[in-house]
Regions:
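Structure-specific DNA junction-binding interface
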Residues: 1-62, 68-104
Length: 104
């Protein structure tokens, strides 16, 4: 297995700080979603990189009344991979997901 690319200590520190910031942003968004302060559609329409890189399964599991089983069932019905990220949704997948979540 090849070695990872060599980067400076400063570049590594910046990348780690960015990763921590993105995790905090996603956690805050999911918390607000669970509390009903945000709507799931905001994630699909978001241009924030941290939100765009969230997995669809995580988004669904954050909705009130949803758990892993319900989230996986919806993903299977709609034909979306369990590891698909918001930014990777195709237009057909997005339309099917929106139809499935209509009224929630």
């Amino acid at each position: 297995m090849p070695n990872p690319p060599e980067i400076s200590t400063e570049a590594r520190r910046q990348a780690l700080a960015k990763a921590v910031d993105h995790r905090k942003q996603r956690a805050e968004f999911k918390r607000e979603l669970a509390e009903g302060k945000r709507f799931w559609r905001e994630a699909l329409d978001s241009e924030v990189e941290a939100i765009q890189r969230m997995r669809i399964k995580e988004l669904l599991e954050s909705l009130p009344g949803f758990g892993t089983i319900r989230a996986v069932a919806i993903l299977d019905r709609v034909g979306i991979s369990h590891t698909r990220r918001i930014q990777g949704l195709g237009s057909t997948q997005r339309a099917k997901l929106e139809l499935e979540l209509k009224g929630r």
